[in-house]
């Protein structure tokens, strides 16, 4: 009998923001109970499957990682309920912007992963710009200090899912460093 494989290191690439876990629970399993999105276990499986398929059949695919910056400070200032509500609203915004063929998951305390199937990098940039514009509108007035940073990458021939996510993560870290 095969068990569920251990979560590889590429799934959660380190949360660059110190997080008070009493404010926001860590996502676990197949579904995230806080946001209603799929969880890190689905992210792990979908990444390998969809990246392999895209490379094998020469199909477009882009992986997007999004980091919510300022959510912990929001919780410290306005309370846990506001922080959790804000994270749920951002999750629902990302979900609304994806198609039924895409995957939108919560993969870390303040991190989301999106697999955009049949989407090249130019189309993914359009997704990112729509999310940058719409996500802040979903937050309560107290969420003014909350910002989203994004990284994205499309697979290169023969590239592993882990390498793809690392490239997207590097782009995310670069954006966060340039703020």
Predicted region positions:
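Hydrophobic, well-ordered secondary-structure segments
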Residues: 116-121, 135
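Conserved long alpha-helical elements within nucleotide-processing catalytic cores of c-di-GMP signaling
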Residues: 32, 37-51, 55-62, 69-95, ...
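Short, charged, intrinsically disordered terminal tails
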Residues: 24, 169, 173-179
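Short, conserved catalytic or interaction motifs in soluble domains
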Residues: 76, 117, 140, 176-177
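Short catalytic/binding micro-motifs of nucleotide second-messenger systems
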Residues: 96-101, 132-143
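Structural motif
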Residues: 61-63, 101-102, 145
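A short glycine-enriched loop-to-beta-strand structural element that forms part of the catalytic core
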Residues: 106, 110-117, 142-171
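Signal-transducing coiled-coil linker helices
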Residues: 1-52, 102-103, 159
């Amino acid at each position: 009998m095969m068990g569920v494989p251990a979560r590889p290191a590429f799934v959660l690439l380190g949360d660059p923001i110190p997080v008070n876990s009493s404010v926001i629970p860590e996502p676990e399993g197949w579904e995230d109970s806080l946001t209603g999105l799929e969880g890190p276990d689905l992210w792990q499986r979908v990444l390998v499957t969809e990246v392999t398929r895209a490379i094998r059949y020469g199909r477009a695919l882009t992986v997007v990682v999004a980091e919510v910056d300022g959510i912990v400070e929001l919780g410290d200032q306005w309370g846990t309920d506001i922080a959790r509500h804000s994270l749920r609203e951002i999750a629902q915004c990302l979900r609304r912007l994806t198609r039924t063929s895409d995957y939108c998951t919560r993969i870390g305390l303040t991190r989301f992963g999106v697999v955009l199937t049949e989407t090249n990098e130019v189309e993914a940039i359009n997704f990112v710009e729509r999310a940058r514009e719409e996500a802040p509108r979903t937050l309560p007035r107290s969420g003014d200090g909350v910002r989203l940073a994004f990284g994205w990458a499309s697979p290169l021939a023969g590239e592993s899912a882990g390498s793809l996510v690392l490239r997207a993560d590097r782009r995310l870290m670069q954006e966060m460093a340039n703020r």
